[in-house]
Amino acid sequence: MNFADSFRDKVALVAGGTGALGQEISLAFLDAGASVVATYRRKEEFDQLVSAAASAGFGTPAGALVDATDAGAVAAAVQKLIDERGRLDVLVNAVGGYAGGKNVWEEDLATFPRMMALNLESGFILARAVLPVMIRQNRGWIVNIASRAAYGHSAGAALYSASKAGALALFDSLALEVKSYAINVNSVVPSIFDTPANRRAMPSVDPARWPKPAEIARVVVFLCSEQARVIHGAAIPVYGRT
């Protein structure tokens, strides 16, 4: 489906919008004509996004250096966005982090709050900041980037799985809370997808079976389109052939 210019005059906040998947989501919304604000933690990653957008002939994304686990910083960034642009149509939560390789009884105690902050608390903070705006508008789309690990069966990554399961439940509950408004809330659920880091971590696995970040990004854009208004409270698997 071609979304060229279908998001013109819409504003998309892509939290974590410069990572391997987040960058492709930011680019996909730019390609569809949206005004994109991408949050980031590393300036060099935002610079890469700007360069990729320019090379593709897209508009220039705006950036916000924000720690998504800092409620005050997120609230300030959202307020700045509203002050400058007057509206917020889309939130994509692509913030997250991974820790694995240890059994539960071997894990450092510090790993638990870190996984919960990156993968669960950040989504709560973001949703809490943008929902009052979307409710006032009576219009909006929220997409949470979840993980197949949320469904369990992830030996060696129990804390990551638990944090992602919590986030999936959070956004599922949020969908029920806003069902009387014209606000759509969904999750996209990837498994392993094709990134340089995953190729390095699994050199013996054929990456041809993995979905590309750009393919997942197109699903995210579709879920934020008028054509997908009927999809609400869903968790869409994007596993490819993994």
Please identify what each model-predicted range represents:
Residues 11, 18-19:
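Conserved glycine-rich cofactor-binding loop
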Residues 34-49:
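Conserved glycine-rich Rossmann-like NAD(P)H-binding loop of the short-chain dehydrogenase/reductase
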Residues 102-104, 108-113:
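Substrate-binding pocket helix/loop in short-chain dehydrogenase/reductase
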Residues 127, 163:
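Active-site helix of classical SDR
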Residues 132, 176-177, 229:
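Alpha-helical segment proximal to the catalytic Tyr-Lys
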Residues 147:
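Residue(s) in the substrate-gating loop at a strand-loop-helix junction
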Residues 180-181, 187-188, 195, 203-242:
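C-terminal helical subdomain
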